[in-house]
Amino acid sequence: MSLMKVLAIDLGASSGRVMQAVYNGSSLQLSEVHRFKNEPVNLNDGLYWNLLHLFGEIKQGIKKASNDSIPIRSISVDTWGVDYAYLDHNGDLLYQPHCYRDNRMGRYEESFYQLISKNELFKKTGVQPATYNTILQIYSDLQEKPQLKEVVQRVLFIPDLINYLLAGVLANEYTIASTSGLLDVFTQDFSEEIFEKLGIPTKWFSSPVKNGSVLRDLSPRIVQELKVEPFKVIAGAGHDTAAAVLAIPYENEKGTVFISCGTWSLVGIESDKPIITDEAFESGLTNEGCFDGKYRLLQNTTGMWIIQELQRDWRSQGEEVSFAEMVQLAEKVTDNQTWIYPNDPVFASPGDMESKIKEFCKVTGQAVPQTKGHIVRIVIESLALTYLETIEQLEDLTKQEMTTVQMVGGGIQNKLLCQITANFTNRLVITGPVEASALGNILSQLFTLEVIHSRQEAQNLIKASEVVTRYEPQAVEEFSNIQQKFKQIKKGISSC
């Protein structure tokens, strides 16, 4: 067959890329076309994403990708979850989208949960209640700006918004909508009952698009501006984790836990049915949507965010420390006896991450790290301990032994994290691909275009295109003591 090019806009919470994959009928050749920063902007009234900047960068990437003779067949977008934008009756953006790390939701949590309890919300939506969830964000917006009910015509999640800017079609895609806390977990459609209870207009959303959909060709205005040939804009796997899971080259899906490791780490399994038991709720697990309509039962845990913030801290102090250098420094620390709980709210907000880690260690009665290497080692080991905690919860809930961990995403470039995860979980860890979200985005387009037709075909394509690495577990001396101390640290902070 002739070569075919497919583009993926892959936006993370710290950077964005336009990627291209050239498909030759048996494998994919993935390459980065354009990379750019994505950082929220602090304004007087909150924290916002600079969507206009991002869209300008996306157009640059499309232009660069068109500079050879291989025709572009389609493009799709995947992003982080929960965030969204308001459009008015003219289809115009009302204001830049809020960032999920904005603090406005804290002012309205109490009144929100008086209307619907956390347990009821979980049972209806399958989504673990969290401050950053779309449902609480929108409720908070309506408390502060009740006039939104009069001026807003549609609400689009971030990938939906970019698709709209590219093609002019208003659509809500299923996988990204499944992160919102607004869908009925069984019907996989927006819950009228919840909307009515919270006073959210149902007209703001449309029934989610599932299993991929061709929206329209790239808008004539952009075609003319960029001087490119028209190609299809597809609503594929809009949520980056759903995309990443689609690209996992399972050796055996049964008995395998996935970890999608980026700014966040998503630790979970694929399931034919949602699990909304009290045990799942109390364990902090959530049910999100897969591209093929299945469910991702997972825990949203902190990922490389703390490492990224440490790097930002040190850069602001005039010290440029690369991620590779951070790992090298951490590898030299072999006698660590200090850990943090990465999911503690203190680590969720940006800034002063080194000070937060030291203060946490002090408050919990542990040795306070004095070197960069020790700080990074603490973070890496603590992430692996958090992964183990979730794996054991998944085993308890499903009554199924999890023998293998498949890690994907940018975080797997941290080989120390991968090996420590194997050691601490005492399980085989298989890593790859690094660019799982982009590849899953590509695969969702190939499904939509009917180029591929099954998950097995998709997995074979990834195996033919990407390299995977295996990490065998190595014994850790007195690991039961380490695990027990970590549990005590977590219990101690929860009782504070």
List PLM regions with ranges.
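N-terminal glycine/serine-rich phosphate-binding loop of ATP-dependent small-molecule kinases
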Residues: 1-95, 223-233, 425-427, 496
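Short glycine-rich phosphate-binding loop at a beta-alpha junction
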Residues: 71-79, 154, 207, 400-409
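Short, acidic/turn-prone active-site loops that include or flank metal/cofactor-
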Residues: 35, 39, 98-105, 263-265, ...
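Short, well-ordered amphipathic alpha-helical segments that serve as non-catalytic structural scaffolds
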Residues: 53-66, 187-193, 386-393
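Active-site core segments that coordinate phosphate-bearing ligands/cofactors
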Residues: 7-8, 20, 113-125, 139-157, ...
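Enzymes and membrane/adaptor proteins characterized by extended Gly/Ser/Thr/Asp/Glu-rich
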Residues: 168-176
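Active-site phosphate-binding/coordination module
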Residues: 63-133
